[in-house]
């Protein structure tokens, strides 16, 4: 089920996060699958990545996992397709490739790296999909404030900030994907 294309979901590998974020992740996956999108993710069983993978299976969606060989022990067993890379940099590129949107769920430093990298590529005209940070429970408000600071300091133009969508509900994410 990826008739509308694929979206990449960036998310946490941590098991220690508040479960409300995992529930929010499930809602985003259900919304994307119901609209006919295939999912691309980090492809592991760890943390929210595993939650995303489980929800794609429950929804009957298609799921491509992208991971470097050194993470093979964490491979989610029920992926439709696995893309192996040598490095984390290659992983990020392979995850984005051919997607129509990139959604960052609340996550850690890896998620932030993926989100900012994708936003940078969008600014440079090298990523044409939508860049979405799911601002569930205000999670990305500090990032928004930092980016606004960059704009006010003249380090970044407002056009870059305008490329970043910050929906607060799964319904708002779905509206951006329609």
Regions found by a protein language model. Give the residues of each.
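Glycine-rich beta-alpha loop segments
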Residues: 1-61
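Glycine/threonine-rich flexible loop motifs
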Residues: 18-20, 112-115
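Glycine-rich, charge-decorated loop segments at or immediately adjacent to ligand/cofactor-binding or catalytic sites
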Residues: 47-51, 139-148
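Short Gly/Thr/Asp-enriched flexible loops that form oxyanion-binding sites at enzyme active sites
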Residues: 50-56, 114-124
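Short, acidic/small-residue loops that bind anionic groups at enzyme active sites
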Residues: 67, 105, 121-144, 158-160
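A charged, well-structured terminal subsegment
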Residues: 101, 152-178
């Amino acid at each position: 089920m990826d008739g509308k294309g694929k979206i990449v979901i960036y998310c946490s590998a941590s098991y220690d996060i508040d479960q409300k974020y995992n529930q929010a992740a499930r809602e985003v996956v259900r919304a994307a699958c119901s609209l006919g999108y295939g999912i691309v993710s980090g492809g592991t069983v760890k943390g929210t990545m595993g939650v995303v993978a489980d929800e794609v299976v429950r929804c009957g969606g298609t799921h491509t996992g992208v991971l470097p060989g050194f993470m093979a022990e964490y491979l989610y067993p029920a992926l439709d397709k696995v893309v192996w890379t040598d490095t984390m940099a290659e992983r990020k590129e392979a995850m984005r490739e051919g997607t129509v949107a990139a959604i960052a769920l609340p996550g850690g430093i890896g998620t932030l790296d993926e989100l900012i990298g994708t936003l940078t590529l969008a600014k440079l005209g090298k990523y044409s999909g939508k860049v979405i940070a799911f601002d569930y429970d205000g999670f990305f408000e500090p990032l928004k404030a930092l980016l606004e600071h960059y704009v006010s300091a003249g380090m970044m133009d407002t056009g870059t900030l305008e490329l970043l969508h910050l929906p607060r509900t799964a319904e708002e994410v779905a509206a951006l994907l329609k």
